[in-house]
């Protein structure tokens, strides 16, 4: 059942190594390499989005890979929230991750 007022953030949305057709929804410049669920959860918590982690879910386009997902409060467009989460993760990872990007 779908939670009202929540957005689903799949790790593939933020993954720099994925193409747009594979599911990435933000630009490569703003994306991060191999985002982890705990990083997404922590970034969403810092942004005040009340994250809920569902670790045993699989992204429908790649149903054989169980990547998990994070539900966050719906405070605006999904792409804007995904970009904010990715930038927060970049900040948490430190300067070495942005130098590689």
Curated annotation (Swiss-Prot):
The keyword Ribonucleoprotein applies. GO terms for cellular component: signal recognition particle. InterPro entries: Signal_recog_particle_SRP19, SRP19-like_sf, SRP19_arc-type. It comes from the Archaea. Disulfide bonds: none annotated. GO terms for biological process: SRP-dependent cotranslational protein targeting to membrane, signal sequence recognition. It holds the Pfam family SRP19. GO terms for molecular function: 7S RNA binding. Keywords: Cytoplasm, Ribonucleoprotein, RNA-binding, Signal recognition particle. It is found in: Cytoplasm. SUPFAM superfamilies: SRP19. Gene3D superfamilies: Signal recognition particle, SRP19-like subunit (3.30.56.30). Involved in targeting and insertion of nascent membrane proteins into the cytoplasmic membrane. Binds directly to 7S RNA and mediates binding of the 54 kDa subunit of the SRP. Belongs to the SRP19 family. Part of the signal recognition particle protein translocation system, which is composed of SRP and FtsY. Archaeal SRP consists of a 7S RNA molecule of 300 nucleotides and two protein subunits: SRP54 and SRP19. This is Signal recognition particle 19 kDa protein.
